[in-house]
Amino acid sequence: MSVFISFEGVDGSGKSTQIRLLLQYLDEQSVPYVFTREPGGTPIAEQIRRVLLDPANRGMSVITEALLFAAARAEHVSRTIRPALEEGKVVICDRFVDSSLVYQGVAGGLPVEFLTQINEMATGALRPHRTIVLDLAPEVALARRTGEEADRIERQSREYHQLVREGYLDLARAEPRRVKVVDASRSVEEVQKDIRRLVEEVLPRRFRGAGTRP
């Protein structure tokens, strides 16, 4: 049985660190997995990523942004995610469709129905078995990123990122079985412990019960 797990959250919420620790844990447990990210995951999708995140493209319209994300996602799903799932692997993805619903929908103002439609076409209606949202106040997330060069989306206003946070929390309330919120303001070890527990809940039985040590 394959499992698809996505990670979401405001920029600076600690996704990269927590995913890295989770992958180390999966290695220790001999769980076959593929790690990938959005936008990106294939050569074509990575080219689209560069366009989307380039600060020089700050004038990009939200509809262009949404369509580019969907195009990258279509390529990503067909060439990376679905093949890995068909091989019975666990797929760990840094962002997926929920990012579009929240960033271009809730924060960007596009109709969620439109975003849902184009992304269902792009993915063949593929949905993660579990989505883990790392929740952190935007001002705290911004402070964590001091010294790092911000991309085009990260340079949006604090109000924009607050809408993103609220969008994720609303999503978790709407889909509580799939979307789980983890308080990312705590220590790295505490956050990782919760993530491992949530991941183990959806892993095939043969991979469960190996412990949740940080």
Swiss-Prot record:
Keywords: ATP-binding, Kinase, Nucleotide biosynthesis, Nucleotide-binding, Transferase. Phosphorylation of dTMP to form dTDP in both de novo and salvage pathways of dTTP synthesis. GO terms for biological process: dTDP biosynthetic process; dTTP biosynthetic process; dUDP biosynthetic process. Its EC number is 2.7.4.9. This is Thymidylate kinase. It is an enzyme of class 2 (transferase). Belongs to the thymidylate kinase family. It catalyses: dTMP + ATP = dTDP + ADP. GO terms for cellular component: cytosol. The keyword ATP-binding applies. ATP binds at residues 9-16. One of its GO terms (molecular function) is ATP binding.
